[in-house]
UniProtKB/Swiss-Prot annotation:
Residues 1-48, 95-117, 176-236, 401-432 are annotated as: Disordered. The lineage of its organism: Eukaryota, Metazoa, Chordata, Craniata, Vertebrata. Keywords: DNA-binding, Metal-binding, Nucleus, Repeat, Repressor, Transcription, Transcription regulation, Zinc, Zinc-finger. This is Zinc finger protein 653. GO terms for biological process: extracellular negative regulation of signal transduction; negative regulation of transcription by RNA polymerase II; regulation of transcription by RNA polymerase II. The keyword DNA-binding applies. It comes from the Eukaryota. Residues 419-432 have a biased composition (Acidic residues). A motif (Nuclear localization signal) lies at residues 107-118, 445-451. Interacts with NR5A1. One of its GO terms (molecular function) is AF-2 domain binding.
Length: 615
């Protein structure tokens, strides 16, 4: 009986002990549910440093190769680890093949750069075409039309009376041929789509070759005389019509040998650079039908041509007059420029051949419409006005106007015979018998208009006027009047009127687009995703800052101690170390954390206490 009485007591004690252990376990479980014990600041800093070191070991700084790496990974569909392993194995195979070090690269042969020809048109081929056509056809070719259809170059159409035609593309030095252009060599040699095998409407024999007559030779000579190289280069034209670039010693040696030369025009600058296409215009000035600019000064001659409406004139083109004693070099082989292209004006006597020469130092003039049939006289006052215009304008753009037919009587009455010639820029007087009517014309390249800064005001000294904000405590300074006015109206007068409607936010902005950009934060949409790790963001600039963790960029730097960081917030927080003690006057109602600004408290509440409803 006694043993049986002891057994229930032992069982009760065992049950009580088991109940105590269970209660202890439940208490321990309850303590774990409340969270782990808070670490000290030193322990937290030590753990943060250890985790950062582990992350730095795994981090690979790609730098500028980050973009190509992402593209390669996207095309291959591999992970970063698989792609890296493949590249390492590929590099090992290349290293074993060439028995070199991993960082040695296979030497590449440098690409030889094509040398562009200095002259636009090769006169040697032009002479060959002209001589061949002369043996096959009795008629002399002349310039039929200019077709600036393509804009990059002008197509000159040369045609004889038998109908043999040749199309020549004349490129402007303002738009030089690129070295990578496969057709640059052909253009440099004067070859175009319809070269010596171009079809003609008259015959089917070899005479269908495109004729290059005296006008072609004169035009190509003028094109070669114009330097396509940088300003200051020059060249010469021999009796064979070949343009040769030269220096001063070369010229002296050729002059001693007695080689007849035709030097480049003396004008340098836009006038010399834009002399490319030859447009013969049969202009007659004077009382007689065969008078050619007798006793006419250089400026007056330019004014005459500028006021003359020429058929086929391209709108927006520049007109340059070239004349002088260099015509003998072009006519040494008996070549004369045929200017008998019909003008369609009966009785004007424009069917006669006019000899051509070159005149140096003539500036461009602005072309204007002639004043009907009202005769005008060129007195001393008008000549003085022309000189003033020439001094003020280095290069005049032609006004866009409608094409009109030239009228010979108007031109005859424009410049009287009594006008006294004036000296040229080099001090030599022009000989009227050596003058010509060669006019060079190219389509003028449209100038890019730079958009001027709006509302900028210049003071008397030519400096930008600065606009200082007049309100007390504001140190903003602007150089544009519109920006200054926007600042005053929005910041000091109107204020932040755009309020965020999200509950608990209430942030205000000056502009509506700033509010729309802010509303993305409350929408929860993350449309900006990192290509490397897949992390998404609500704002694009947040993604750009995050990418710096992969590339290792630290573009922001402290001006005092040199501390570098990735984002502006880190730099602002760091700068507090160099300033006075910051006053934390705002406290969170839930956790008691203190902040410097009220906006920081609102942002902290939204992020750390999302369930808290503002009172």
């Amino acid at each position: 009986m006694a043993e049986r009485a002891l057994e229930p007591e032992a069982e009760a004690e065992a049950e009580a002990g088991a109940g105590g252990e269970a209660a202890a376990e439940e208490g321990a479980a309850g303590r774990k549910a409340r969270g782990r014990p808070r670490l000290t600041e030193s322990d937290r800093a030590r753990r943060r440093l250890e985790s950062r070191k582990k992350y730095d070991v795994r981090r690979v700084y790609l730098g500028e190769a980050h973009g190509p790496w992402v593209d390669l990974r996207r095309r291959s569909g591999w992970s970063d680890a698989k792609l890296a392993a493949y590249l390492i194995s590929l590099e090992r195979g290349q290293r074993s093949g060439r028995h070199g070090k991993p960082w040695e690269q296979v030497p590449k042969k440098p690409k030889r750069k094509k040398r562009r020809r200095r002259n636009v048109n090769c006169l040697k081929n032009v002479v060959i075409w002209y001589e061949d056509h002369k043996h096959r056809c009795p008629y002399e070719p002349h310039l039929a039309e200019l077709d600036p259809t393509f804009g990059l170059y002008t197509t000159a159409v040369w045609q004889c009376e038998a109908g043999h035609r040749y199309f020549q593309d004349l490129h402007s030095p303002l738009k030089p041929l690129s070295d990578s252009d496969p057709d640059s060599d052909k253009v440099g040699n004067g070859l175009v789509a319809g070269s010596s095998d171009s079809s003609s409407s008259g015959s089917a024999s070899d005479s269908e070759e495109s004729p290059e007559g005296q006008p072609v030779k004169a035009a190509a000579a003028a094109a070669a005389a114009t330097p396509t190289s940088p300003v200051g280069s020059s060249g010469l034209i021999t009796q064979e019509g070949v343009h040769i670039p030269f220096d001063v010693h070369h010229v002296e040696s050729l002059a001693e040998q007695g080689t007849p030369l035709c030097s480049n025009p003396a004008g340098n600058g836009p006038e010399a650079l834009e002399t490319v296409v030859c447009v013969p215009v049969p202009v007659q000035v004077g009382a007689g039908p065969s008078a050619l600019f007798e006793n006419v000064p250089q400026e007056a001659l330019g004014e005459v041509v500028a006021s003359c409406p020429m058929p086929g004139m391209v709108p927006g083109s520049q007109v340059i007059i070239i004349a002088g004693p260099g015509y003998d070099a072009l006519t040494a082989e008996g070549i004369h420029l045929n200017m008998a292209a019909g003008s369609g004006v009966p009785g004007s006597g424009l069917g006669e051949e006019v000899p051509c020469a070159m005149m140096e130092g003539v500036a461009a003039y602005t072309q204007t419409e002639p004043e009907g049939s009202q005769p005008s006289t060129m007195d001393a006052t008008a000549v003085a006005g022309i000189e003033t215009k020439k001094e003020k304008e280095d290069l005049c753009l032609l006004k866009k106007e409608e094409k009109e037919e030239p009228v010979a009587p108007e031109l005859a009455t424009t410049v009287p015979e009594s006008a006294e010639p004036e000296a040229e820029a080099d001090g030599e007087e022009l000989d009227g018998s050596d003058m010509s009517a060669i006019i060079y014309e190219i389509p003028k390249e449209p100038e890019k208009r730079r958009r001027s800064k709006r509302s900028r005001v210049m003071d008397a000294d030519g400096l930008l006027e600065m606009f200082h904000c007049p309100y007390e405590g504001c140190s903003q300074v602007y150089v544009a009047l519109s920006s200054f006015q926007n600042h005053v109206n929005l910041v000091h007068r109107k204020g932040k009127t755009k309020v965020c409607p999200h509950p608990g936010c209430g942030k205000k902005f000056y502009l509506s687009n700033h509010l729309r950009r802010h509303m993305i934060i409350h929408s929860g949409v993350r449309e900006f995703t990192c290509e490397t790790c897949g992390k998404s963001f609500k704002r694009k600039n947040h993604l750009e800052v995050h990418r710096r963790t992969h590339t290792g960029e630290t573009p922001l730097q402290c001006e005092i101690c040199g501390y570098q960081c990735r984002q502006r917030a880190s730099l602002n927080w760091h700068m507090k170390k160099h300033t006075a003690e910051v006053q934390y006057n705002f406290t969170c109602d839930r956790c008691g954390k203190r902040f410097e600004k009220l906006d920081s408290v609102k942002f902290h509440t939204l992020k750390s206490h999302p369930d808290h409803k503002p009172t």
